[in-house]
């Protein structure tokens, strides 16, 4: 079942984030992750965390965060992370479509995401769900 994550899920979600970071070779800082997750688990002000629960265990998660843009015509969102333990099971597709529907019901007009340019498999997955490569280039700067 897919449901909203709660503070009671924090430990299991952090474990899933660790697995995601390990699989994708991203740095993992459990304190930073916990500090970022807590506000999302408390209310909808910054976004939502969705989890797949099977027999009392979490087997996947998705994080959607809110933004606002003139170009989008109002509220937009970023699919910040999505991860499922069982690849090729259909769970990733189910979770992605669920988050799209939920974001739409919360008034989001666009959903954005980013993935590594070389990851053709994942890019194909997102393309099958209607995501398109844009001509724009995102730049970032740490404000820490």
Where are these regions (language model features)?
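Residue-level recognition of the GNAT/N-acetyltransferase active site
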Residues: 67, 85-87, 116
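Conserved acetyl-CoA-binding loop of GNAT-fold acetyltransferases
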Residues: 126-136
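Hydrophobic adenine-recognition pocket in adenosine-nucleotide-binding enzymes
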Residues: 5, 82-84, 115
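Conserved acetyl-CoA binding element of GNAT-fold acetyltransferases
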Residues: 74-86
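Conserved acetyl-CoA-binding loop-helix of GNAT-fold acetyltransferases
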Residues: 84, 89-101, 128
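Acetyl-CoA-dependent GNAT
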Residues: 4-11, 15-74, 96-97, 102, ...
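Low-complexity, intrinsically disordered Gly/Pro/Thr-rich segments
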Residues: 113-128
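Conserved GNAT acetyl-CoA-binding A-motif
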Residues: 104-115
